[in-house]
């Protein structure tokens, strides 16, 4: 935990508005002048890199602030050089940056990524990948050397009912769970992070 004692800084927040069919839910990010956006490498203890097994980061971090993006990319390089696994979630948010800028930035990071989390929609739209889902996932491994690629597919039947399933590609094999159809959504905030945390927990515990 890093504490920011500056009286000018604050916690970043965002505002979530639930959807009502046919209108989708929406989010407004309010991260300007937050402590997180002013993070610098000097604030991190130097021994943190060698002590870390998995360093996880999301593309939202890269989109919030130019200075933070530069710091985050340097952190990826330093953790990678120290031998940590790099876990990266390509959760693209159109309200934070353009598809062109996001694509250019994340593709430059992919060669350092061991565990890649990317939805089928993001692969096809922002990253402009074509082919079957299996071909797209295998392509990340073949092109960038990613060890694990996990992708999710979410279909919104309505704002309160979704279909969901996921697929993982690792060591030349695909793993897929039975889909969850028409599940009732109580609150989906953080559901993607929970899925990701489960995958990383499984990797740490079972390899």
Residues covered by each model-derived region:
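Glycine/threonine-rich flexible loop motifs
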Residues: 61-70, 98, 126-129
